[in-house]
UniProtKB/Swiss-Prot annotation:
One function term, GO molecular function aspect: phosphoribosylaminoimidazolesuccinocarboxamide synthase activity
Protein's pathway: Purine metabolism; IMP biosynthesis via de novo pathway; 5-amino-1-(5-phospho-D-ribosyl)imidazole-4-carboxamide from 5-amino-1-(5-phospho-D-ribosyl)imidazole-4-carboxylate: step 1/2
Keyword Cell inner membrane tagged: no
NCBIfam families: PRK13961.1 (NF010568), purC (TIGR00081)
Protein name (Swiss-Prot/TrEMBL): Phosphoribosylaminoimidazole-succinocarboxamide synthase
UniProt KW keywords: ATP-binding, Ligase, Nucleotide-binding, Purine biosynthesis
Superkingdom of the source species: Bacteria
Family classification: Belongs to the SAICAR synthetase family.
Species annotation: Aromatoleum aromaticum (strain DSM 19018 / LMG 30748 / EbN1)
Reaction it catalyzes: 5-amino-1-(5-phospho-D-ribosyl)imidazole-4-carboxylate + L-aspartate + ATP = (2S)-2-[5-amino-1-(5-phospho-beta-D-ribosyl)imidazole-4-carboxamido]succinate + ADP + phosphate + 2 H(+)
Cellular compartments per GO CC: cytoplasm
E.C. numbers: 6.3.2.6
Length: 311
């Protein structure tokens, strides 16, 4: 197990920003270095304790899916070794947890695909009979499989804020407003890119879910992010089908009517729900057993899905 990394301190490259989990550095005008830390957030608050190997799991799993799904849509990978773009004394910080990626313009939406009625979708369905405005058959139970996957985009929120579900029409409007000016002469436009993102996201989800089913895992839902290059070509960016962006259930314990256990930070959420805490920063420290169980769940998800061991 590698030494946990809460925050990278790369000095040889300019720091562009830090998200909930990832630190972003400029390599040059065309490329970025993405360092995936071991930070963990819950209820949109970054907690003070890192989860050992979490960043390595997320990076290895994303790389696995980028390779497996690359025939569906281009992705952000450059193939450049992250250790080659930092100083020699910084290589330990990036080893196994970093990617050198193309510098692309992100679409201003989260591309969420749902295959099951769970989470906020279950609450929405109970209240309205629909999820994000998409009408569904009556009488579905919690965690029921949908007749077919649905695309339910969300707005992108700043760190500490909540993403907001939006309609597909609103997603098209957002993409048109933010991207159309960048696409002059490219033969496409923002609204068309939103449609491309929807179609790509559903195709990615279906292929990944079919693969995962053969490994004994249900992918209940997932969130993709897309970006475009200067020619307006859509690329899969950020992370793909990790425990942070997806809801993974062990198939052998799945049944309708309950919220199944998942391969993610559920141990942390369950523990935090026992505290008198306002769910605002600063977050509380985690007990050692919660940290260990969460780390084990992340590693188990990677090993079961890929058939590989974390190097």
């Amino acid at each position: 197990m590698a030494q946990p990394l809460f925050e990278s301190t790369i000095k040889s490259l300019p720091l562009l920003g830090r998200g909930k989990v990832r630190d972003i550095y400029a390599v040059d005008a065309d490329k970025l270095l993405i360092v995936t830390s071991d930070r963990l957030s819950a209820f949109d608050v970054i907690l003070p304790d890192p989860i050992p190997d979490k960043g390595r799991v997320l990076t290895a799993m994303a790389a696995f899916w980028f390779a497996r799904l690359g025939h569906i849509v281009p992705n952000q990978l450059t193939g450049i070794d992250p250790e080659s773009v930092v100083a020699s004394d910084e290589r330990d910080q990036v080893r196994g947890r970093s990617l050198v990626v193309k510098r692309l313009k992100p679409l201003p939406i989260e591309a969420v695909v749902r295959g099951y009625v769970i989470g906020s979708g279950w609450k929405d369905y109970q209240d309205t009979g629909a999820i994000c405005g998409i009408r569904l058959p009556a009488g579905l139970a919690q965690a029921a499989k949908l007749p077919s996957p649905i695309f339910t985009p969300a707005s992108k929120a700043d760190v500490g804020d909540h993403d907001e579900n939006i309609s597909f029409a609103a997603a098209q409007t957002r993409c048109a407003a933010e991207l159309t000016g960048l696409l002059a002469g490219s033969g496409t436009n923002g609204a068309r890119l939103a449609t491309e993102a929807r179609d790509a996201a559903i195709t990615l989800y279906v292929e990944a879910a079919n693969y995962a089913a053969g490994r004994g895992i249900i992918i209940a839902d997932t969130k993709f992010e897309f970006g475009i290059d200067s020619a307006g070509t859509l690329h899969l960016i950020d992370e793909a089908l990790t425990p942070d962006s997806s809801r993974f259930w062990p198939a052998d314990s799945y049944r309708e009517g309950i919220s199944p256990p998942s391969y993610d930070k559920q141990y942390v959420r369950d523990y935090l729900e026992t505290l008198t805490w306002g769910k605002k920063a600063p977050g509380p420290h985690l007990p050692a057993d919660v940290i260990a169980k969460t780390a084990a769940k992340y590693r188990e998800a990677f090993e079961r899905l890929t058939g590989q061991s974390l190097a």
